[in-house]
Amino acid sequence: MVEAINLKQVSERKFTGIDQPKLEWAKNWLKNTKKSYVNGKWIEASSSSIFESINPANGEKIGSFYGAGKDEVDKAVAAARSAFDQGPWSKMTRKKRAKIMHEISSLISKHQAELATLETLDNGKLYTESYNDDVQEASDIFAYYAGWTDKYYGENNPVEGDFLSITTRDPIGVCGQIVPFNYPIDMAAWKLAPALAMGNTVVLKPADKTSFSAIRLFEIIDEANILPPGVINLVLGDGSTGSYISRHMGIDKVTFTGSTQIGRQLVRDSADSNLKPVSLELGGKSANILFDDAPNLDEAIDRSFYGLFTHKGEKCSAPTRLFVHRNIYDKAVNRLGELADSYKLGDPFDPETNQGAQVSEEHMERILNYIESGKQQGARVVAGGKRDTDGDNINGYFVRPTIFAEVNNSMKIAQEEIFGPVLCVIPFDTENEVIKMANDSIYGLGAGLWTNDVSRANRVAKKLEAGMVFVNKYGCYDFASPFGGWKQSGWGKEFAVHSLQSYTKQKAIWFAY
C-alpha cells in the first residue's frame, strides 16, 4: 500500500498510465438484475425485493439487484459452515492457499478498468480514484496477506513448574463482513484477504448503494474456479440483510465498517445472539494541527486540503478539523479558500474533474443540512457552502468543497461526522489549548500535526487521543501498520498482523512431564 495522497496526481487528474473506462462494457453488464452468490452459485432471492442503483453524477438508474432475505443469509451461512467444517479450505496447505490469494490479486489487476468503472458509476468518485486507489489497493492487499499465510506462529509460554504450555491460533470459522459505500471493493478486500489467509470462510454484504464492484469481484473469482464452493458468499441487500448476519447464531465473527450508530447496534446483536466477536471501524472527526513552525507551510496547507477533499470527503479518517495557529490562520484560510474555489466538479470520468458526486441524494442532503447548521451557528463560509448545479451537474449530487472559518470546536459541524467535503478551520494560541480541543471529541480515529520542533512533535503525538497520528504528512497508510481508532471510532484494527489475529481464536495447550 503506497502513500495515500500524491499532490501532483491530485492536481492533474490525468488518465496517463491507466486504462480508459470501460463504459460500454459496464452498460451491457448492468442490463441484468444481479443476484447473490451462495455456495458457488448465483441465486435469486426468495422475496420479490429488487434494489435499484443510481449514478450519483446524473441521478439516473444504472442497474439493479435482488435483495437477500433471511433465507438467503441462512443458506450462505450454511454453505460457509460446510466449507469450513468439511471443505478443504481451512485444511489446505498454506502454500496452496497463498497461491490462490496471489491469483485473486492478479485477477483484480487484470480486470482493474472494469472494476474501477463500476465503482465510479455506483459511487460517484473520480475514475482516477477508483482505479489508482480502490482497485489497486484491493489487488495489493490480497498479495500482502498471501505472504502472511505461512508466517504466522504460535507461542511458547514461559510457565512455572514441570509443564510445557504453547499457544495456538486457529481460524475463527464463519465470518460475517459488512462493507461500507465509500470504498466498496477496497473495504471488501480489506476484510476478505486476512480472513481467507487464516483459513476462514466468509459471508460478505456490500452496501446497498454500491454493490456492483463486489458483485463483479465475486464473478471474476467464480469464473476462475479457484476457490471451493462456500468459501466466499455474497448476500445483497440493505440494513435488514446486515442484521440477519449480525444476529445469526451460525456466524462466529462479524466485522463492520460504517457509522458509529450502526456499530452500536451490531454490538447489541452480538449480545442478543451468540456473543460473537465484533470488529468495528466506525466514525471519525480527526484533528489536524498546523503549528506556526510547520515545515514547508504551503505544502502543509495543500496537503491538509487534499487529505480531506479527495474521494469527495467520504472518508472516515479525513482530517475534518484543521486547527491553525493564530499567527498563520489568515494565510491558511485564504489558501484553503483558493483551492476550494478552483475545484471543478462534474463527470467523474472526465480527467479534468477534481471532485465527483456524493454517493446518494439522501447523503447529499445530509451534508447540506450540516452546512446550514454551520452557517446558523455563526461559522463563516470561506468557500462553497452549497450544492453545485452548474451545467450538467443539475441532476447530480454535487456539493461544493466547503471551508468554514471562525469555527468554535463546540459547534455541531466540529463535533459530528459529516462525511463529506466540509472542512472546519479553528484557530488556537497555545499547545495545551489545541491538544484539549483536539481531544474534545467522541471519536479518536486519526490525528495529525505539523511542526519543525521534534520535541513538540513527540510530546503532542503522545497526548493526542487517536489510534493513528501523522506527523508532518497527514494520511500515510501502509498494510504493515495498524489502521483503527480509539473511543467511539471502533474496536480492533485493520491491516498487518493485528487484522489476522482478529480472524483467529486462541488456544492454550498444556503438557505435564
Task: Identify the function of each model-found stretch.
Residues F84, P88, S105-Q112, A116, ...:
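Structural signal for hydrophobic packing residues in well-ordered secondary-structure cores
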Residues E60-Y152:
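Glycine-rich loop-to-alpha-helix module at the N-terminal edge of alpha/beta enzyme cores
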Residues K61-A68, D85-W89, Q177, N288-D292, ...:
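Short, well-ordered beta-strand elements within core beta-sheets of diverse protein domains
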Residues M1-F65, K99, E103, K151-I178, ...:
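Terminal low-complexity tails and localization/encapsulation signals of metabolic enzymes
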Residues G59, R97, E119, G199, ...:
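Residue-level signal for inorganic ion chemistry
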Residues M1, E60-G63, I226, I251, ...:
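Conserved C-terminal structural/oligomerization subdomain of aldehyde/semialdehyde dehydrogenase
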Residues Q261-N408, M437, V471:
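ALDH superfamily catalytic-core signature
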Residues Y153-E299, F428:
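Rossmann-like NAD(P) dinucleotide-binding subdomain of oxidoreductase/dehydrogenase enzymes
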